[in-house]
Regions:
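Periplasmic polypeptide-binding modules associated with outer-membrane biogenesis and secretion
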Residues: 2-184
Length: 184
């Protein structure tokens, strides 16, 4: 194994520790790296589009089984999963296993989008117009990136109506039942 380790993990000092294979980055001895043997995504199981969300979480990650990672890479992947727009929360836990570290990624999916409402002072834009913007997304998991793109369409409509300085604030809270209220 040592000859394999020496050629495969160039730039790392390898050692066996508590039945785990540990690779330490020689450039920064304070940062310990570990071999990832398995990645499990949890939290999507009871969601109507769960399988799609599980794949979205996997696709957002740079870490794959067999990767050697440190905390910096874990944090990057945690942020990447969250930045995908599909999840309102993400946590990464680890478990020691016989072949390395098992990563358990616990995700909290956004709800299924049911309705978007504008809380506005005057009714320049109708709720029917708002529904026409979001109609294709009703009944699907709320993706905050796609949602932001739709808000930009509404802002442009306000500009066309002469309200160029108008701001649409992101929702303070998204209800669990999928109703989003935007403050205008």
């Amino acid at each position: 194994i040592n000859s394999f380790n020496n050629s495969f993990f160039r730039g790392f000092e390898t050692k066996q520790e508590n039945n785990l294979f540990v690779a330490e980055n020689k450039k920064n001895i304070n940062e310990e790296s570990v071999l990832i043997s398995e990645i499990i995504i949890e939290g999507w199981e009871n969601h109507p589009e769960g399988r799609k969300l599980e794949l979205a979480a996997y696709d957002s990650m740079s870490i794959k089984p067999g990767s050697i990672v440190d905390n910096r890479i874990l944090n990057q992947d945690l942020n990447s999963i969250y930045a995908s727009g599909w999840f309102s929360g993400v946590k990464i836990k680890s478990q020691d296993g016989p072949l390395g570290v098992r990563l358990i990624v616990d995700v909290v999916p956004n709800p299924i989008l049911k309705k978007v409402e504008l809380k506005q002072i005057n009714s320049v834009i109708s709720s029917a117009y708002v529904d026409s913007i979001f109609n294709n997304y009703y009944g699907t998991t709320l993706n905050l990136n796609e949602f932001q793109n739709k808000i930009e369409i509404i802002k442009k409509r306000y500009e066309e109506e002469g309200y160029s300085l108008l701001r649409i604030n992101s929702p303070d809270r998204i209800s669990d039942d999928g109703v989003v209220i935007l403050n205008v």
